[in-house]
Regions:
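Amphipathic alpha-helical packing segments from all-alpha helical-bundle domains
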Residues: 14-33, 42-67, 75-79, 105, ...
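Amphipathic alpha-helical linker/stalk segments
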Residues: 1-16
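C-terminal catalytic region of ATP-dependent kinase domains
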Residues: 4, 41-42
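Short acidic, glycine/proline-enriched loop segments that cap or flank alpha-helices
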Residues: 68-76, 95-99
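Amphipathic C-terminal alpha-helical segment
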Residues: 27-30, 34, 60-64, 82-100, ...
Length: 121
């Protein structure tokens, strides 16, 4: 999250998530080496650590704006949304050689649906 531009104050968590999906996509598309290293890592340990770090930063951002409650459940969900997004983009990179608009729409759908289900519980 520190690599991304500062997001404006969002009306709700969905809006913030969409802003950050677009920000991550733009970062990956303009930094191909970082995209490849992040989406095609050499070990699962590195994948998990990056997802956890990004998810924790995302959770802090969402909570700081009072968009999500401060719970371990929501923290873990933010970590999972980071991993889910990377899984979908990894498929795009492997199949298409880039991050396509169709896969980015799928990332947005998946992260919103997952976090929505966690927050509804």
């Amino acid at each position: 999250v520190a690599e991304l531009p500062q997001a404006p104050r969002a009306a709700d968590w969905r809006e913030m998530m969409l802003l950050y999906v677009d920000g991550v996509r733009d970062f990956y598309l303009s930094n191909r080496v970082e995209m490849i290293l992040a989406l095609l890592p050499v070990s699962l340990l590195s994948v998990n650590q990056v997802s956890r770090d990004f998810g924790q930063s995302l959770f802090q951002l969402l909570h700081a704006q009072d968009l999500v409650p401060k719970t371990q459940k929501v923290l873990r969900a933010c970590e999972m949304t980071s991993e889910l997004a990377d899984l979908v983009w990894r498929k795009s990179l492997i199949e298409k050689g880039t991050l396509t608009p169709a896969y980015t729409r799928e990332v947005k759908r998946v992260v919103i649906a997952y976090l929505e289900s966690v927050l509804a519980d």
